Amino acid sequence: MSQLTINNVTVRFGGHTALNNVSMAVESGKITGLIGPNGAGKTTLFNVISGLQRADEGEVTLNGKTITNKAPYKRARYGLGRTFQRLELFPSLTVEENIRVSGEIRNQWASKERNTHTDKSIDEKIKEILTLTGLTDSADYHVAEIPTGKARLVELARSLMQDPKLILLDEPASGQNDLETAEFGQILQKLTKEGITIFLVEHDMSLVMSVCDHVHVLDFGSIIADGSTDEIQSNKRVIDAYLGSEQ
């Protein structure tokens, strides 16, 4: 079952077409990858999905609801979470405090709608997420004191405090060493077992090929291939456009 569908999405910036009639589906409970060269349109597509960029044409649906013209905060209420390529954290706050802020924000709009999603307290939820992301021992450190690899986990933890059904991850392995990337992949696989769908943009092919159930490839704003990791790795057009430079 598709949790997210993108139908014929086109985005233009002046005379430049950033996305050209893009269509794809992200299956529920799976890890889907989006790869392609720099400037292919990957982040632009994530911005369209999350409501930060208006599409000139096309439609986006999430959990069966059309969200094409919805504000970003409304998409979050429909179960969409996101992390960014550039870290969006509070460096002067601790890891635990950064995560707590996200939970408090979620509780504010949930209480207004009389929709609590869960009867867990914020403290219980934070403890659970710290354990899941391996951040328990770093909880009292200020974000400015931890390495980038761990800061990426804090971004993920903050998103999880929103109780998302689908999380968009924009280059989550950036700044991580090989061990951190492997551990991050294991966390993503745990999340799918809990029913959370993952859609990630990533240049680290070791992460993409080890965790993704399905991969889409963008080049010059158009989808040039999609399939399993094995199919993508053996696709000549993909190799010529992108993977060849990674080998």
Question: Predicted regions span which residues?
Answer:
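Glycine-rich phosphate-binding loops of nucleotide-dependent enzymes
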Residues: 2-247
